[in-house]
Curated annotation (Swiss-Prot):
This is Probable 2-(5''-triphosphoribosyl)-3'-dephosphocoenzyme-A synthase 2. Belongs to the CitG/MdcB family. It catalyses: 3'-dephospho-CoA + ATP = 2'-(5''-triphospho-alpha-D-ribosyl)-3'-dephospho-CoA + adenine. It comes from Salmonella typhimurium (strain LT2 / SGSC1412 / ATCC 700720). Keywords: ATP-binding, Nucleotide-binding, Transferase. InterPro entries: CitG (IPR002736), TriPribosyl-deP-CoA_syn_CitG (IPR017551).
Length: 298
């Protein structure tokens, strides 16, 4: 796991340098998630999970490519403070598409971090806006600002009846899943109300940081209506994965290295069922990133 930077900046540093510090934390969040092992159905240091088209090195290259775009999201967020927040998203889309193109170039066409570009792009734009407005930059204010950016997004994009439905529209109409859009529009409640307090509490208890993150991933998997899982396994696959994660948590979760045997077994089951909780992995990245925000003095 990447080390958490200690006291990365101070109040006298210039905005552009601050943006680089926040971008570095977001980059570390992506690396921390993919290096975390073992993760059920996901790419990690041990295997490629339920994926045949991507490997650990793809995620490392992708994170590096995305890293250089993150300050631009902050700059845009800072530049449009006179706009109502719900008007910001339209200007973020071209940045997001350009960042995606950089990701695809780095991975030779493999979609490693599209969900993280969406979530981290929103949060980085929120950082820029709040910094420019001299408002507090904290997990709660960032998620609330991201929610303001996404106001009406689910209705606009998922309730459309196109002749050719996107995967997200199909899952919304069939199963009522809103995916990354719904979580963002709601202000990341799975992170703010569940994952982040859980992770912080485990660290406060002295839990090993990697074990705490793995336990937090299980919590997210048990609660999240993960469209990545549903697109592969349908409602039954999603229900099975949520139940398996919940059972592990009820049995005590991941407290010691001895408990990793349960994750190895869960991983093999996910691989056999071709299930990958990529949406929960994206939310774990958000959780770790927000947990580090307080380290940056601004």
């Amino acid at each position: 796991m990447m080390p958490i930077p200690a006291n990365p900046t101070n109040a006298s540093i210039q905005p552009q340098s601050l943006y680089d510090v926040w971008a570095d934390l977001a980059w570390r969040a992506m690396l921390t998630e993919v290096n975390l092992s073992p993760k059920p159905g996901l790419v990690d240091r041990l295997n490629c999970g339920a994926h045949k088209d991507m490997a650990l090195a793809d995620f490392h290259r992708s994170a590096e490519a995305i890293r250089h775009w993150l300050p631009r999201f902050m700059e845009y967020g800072a530049s449009c403070t006179r706009l109502p927040p719900e008007s910001v998203l339209a200007g973020l889309r071209p940045l997001g598409m350009a960042c995606e193109a950089a990701m695809f170039r780095a991975t030779a066409g493999v979609n490693t971090h599209k969900g993280s570009i969406f979530s981290l792009g929103l949060l980085c734009a929120a950082i820029g806006r709040l910094y420019q407005l001299r408002q507090p930059i904290a997990a709660e204010t960032l998620c609330a600002t991201a929610a303001d950016f996404c106001r009406g997004l689910t209705t606009r994009e998922l309730r459309q009846n196109n002749l050719q439905l996107t995967a997200g529209q199909r899952l919304y109409q069939q199963l009522g899943l809103t995916g990354a859009r719904g979580e963002a529009e709601a202000g990341y409640p799975l992170v703010i109300r569940h994952a982040l307090p859980h992770y912080r509490a485990l660290l406060a208890q002295g839990r090993d940081p990697e074990l705490a993150l793995l336990d937090t991933l299980l919590l997210l998997m048990s609660l999240n209506g993960d469209t990545n899982v549903a697109s592969r396994g349908g409602a039954d696959g999603l229900r099975w994965l949520q139940q398996q994660a919940a059972v592990l948590l009820q049995q005590g979760g991941i407290r010691t290295p001895d408990d990793l045997v349960y994750l190895h077994r869960f991983d093999q089951q996910c691989i056999e069922r071709n299930l990958s909780p990529g949406g929960s992995a994206d939310l774990l990245i958000v959780t770790w990133f927000l947990a580090q925000i307080s380290q940056v003095n601004h």
